Amino acid sequence: MSRIVLGPQKSAKHFFGPKRAHVLVAAMAAALCVPAVGISSGSGLPTSIGKGEGQLNLIAWEGYTQPQWVKPFQKATGCQVHAKYAGSSDEMVTLMRQGGGSQYDGVSASGDASLRLIYGHDVQPVNPNLIPDWKNFIPALKSPPHNTIKGVHYGLSLQWGPNTLLYNTTKVKPTPSSWASIYSPKFKGKVTVPDNPIQIADAALYLSKAQPSLKITDPYELNSTQFNAAVNLLKQQKPLIKKYWALASDEIDLFKNGDAVIGASWPYQTNTLIAAKVPVKDEIPKEGATGWADTWMMSAHAKHPNCMYKWMAWVSTPKVQAQQAIYFGETPANPKACPIMNKLSPGSAGQYHCGASASYFNSIRFWKTPVAACGNGQNDCMDYTKWQQAWTQLKG
């Protein structure tokens, strides 16, 4: 969302400010969650979208509910949007479970939260056929494994992008080309990274190249030896950290004030800082990058399901996809947004890899929830609970 962002996870304190068990859900339960739509007797999913209920309560990454696309949506649908920004995927999961899960209608979940929400019965299946632009999404994001289980869709893909290395061009020389720079004593007290357990994956990705003897092949599937190596690297980094940032705006302030000169970031921060005349650039280092692929998901107890469906349809359109992509600095799920991006901001489609090849998409190690079952058929990986525990202990 931490994300870049979309993007850390991406503290939730702002509204409309600047800016990633069991699967089965009974069909009747799904029907009850959508009281004002047409229901198919076969799937239990709605077959049409009814009249909006008048409001929509969302949990979102900072920068995902901007007035330029929210205000037209409200005018067109009558659904008044109330958005709460979350600073991490962990926070999103917690917020979605508040008040019995009925406080919010939807969430812009990243891949390290979406499966937790599905398996925790916090979100409900949706009918993607009610979203006209879903058919235009890139193939990899129509039914991706982070939001679609055994053919059942639990949300609509939105945007995706890489986590980047952000640096002040006047203070950091030579130009950094490796994630090693954020672990270097050279920048002691001037480094900032997301306040997010998923940072362990970023450390693991770096170590996969820096220490090949660890044999790390997937930064989210770590045995105890690999996991401890990543955590130890982050412990060594801790004295260098100025602040672990929660909101994107926290990191923006650190760079504006000169309190940080290098760190892990999202393109959103880069765009905002450049607009504010702060001398920064970002890079995808030679080791590669982790990243996010976000999904709008509907609460299992949504009070305004029609407005949520209308919102998912709205943000899937080429124009809104283009607006958000440019604003945040990410890539649309809908490639029909690419020419609109170039009209709004010449060259932006190429800049953010809109319509990029599948090989580029596959080169990003997208967030996913760490589980004990490793890809090697073993059950010896550290699950997300251990990641959370290690991160909490690390920060003290």
Feature-to-residue mapping (PLM):
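Conserved C-terminal helix/tail region of periplasmic/extracytoplasmic solute-binding proteins
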Residues: 362-396
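Periplasmic-binding protein-like
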Residues: 231-237, 276-300
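A bilobed periplasmic-binding-protein/Venus flytrap-type ligand-binding module shared by bacterial periplasmic
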Residues: 164-171, 206-207, 292-304, 323-326
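Early extracytoplasmic/lumenal segment of secretory-pathway proteins
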Residues: 43-117
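Extracytoplasmic ligand-binding site segments that recognize negatively charged/polar headgroups
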Residues: 59, 64-66, 90-91, 103-104, ...
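Mature extracytoplasmic/periplasmic domains
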Residues: 290, 299-365
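A ligand-binding cleft/hinge motif common to bilobed small-molecule-binding domains
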Residues: 113-116, 264-279
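Short, low-complexity disordered leader/linker segments with a strong preference
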Residues: 1-55
